[in-house]
Amino acid sequence: IIMSADGYIITNWHVVTNEDGRAFDRIDVKTYDGTVYENAEVVGADQDTDLAVIKVGAAKLSPAQFGDSSGLKLGDKIVAIGNAGGLSWTTTEGIVSGLARDVYEDTGYAIKCLQVDAAINPGNSGGPLLNSQGQVVGINSAKISAPAYEGIGFSIPIKEAKVIIDDLIE
């Protein structure tokens, strides 16, 4: 999710780290217009909240518009964007189906997330969850993956994420 014109990008911790929790040696970023930015810098990453900020060498990116996740209600329409299964710019739609759900990451730390029924799959992580005005209201992060469950995805609310993101940048 492009945060600023000067190259700050929001994503998930688990997107920029390996199994040992260390940042990948090389992170390349491809934007919607096909431009590839090589060797992005990990500015900060927080395992407990599954958030990370990276920076690419750019001066004129088009940042996303950010909304207010605290105003979301059950049943609100949302859109999830990502690279599900390696398929670039996959877009799925759904509704907000839960608020402030505790999602436990590998650390055992609970992250308060929005529950959505839009398809969230491997490759969607770090992508935006948009409201009906096209504003980012969440960061796609996880899903329940079990044979008996379908359509239970989770997104970190942008209001809570912004506090962590600002700390990671400073």
Residue ranges and their predicted role:
Residues 1-3, 41-44, 97, 121:
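Conserved positions in beta-strands of structured domains
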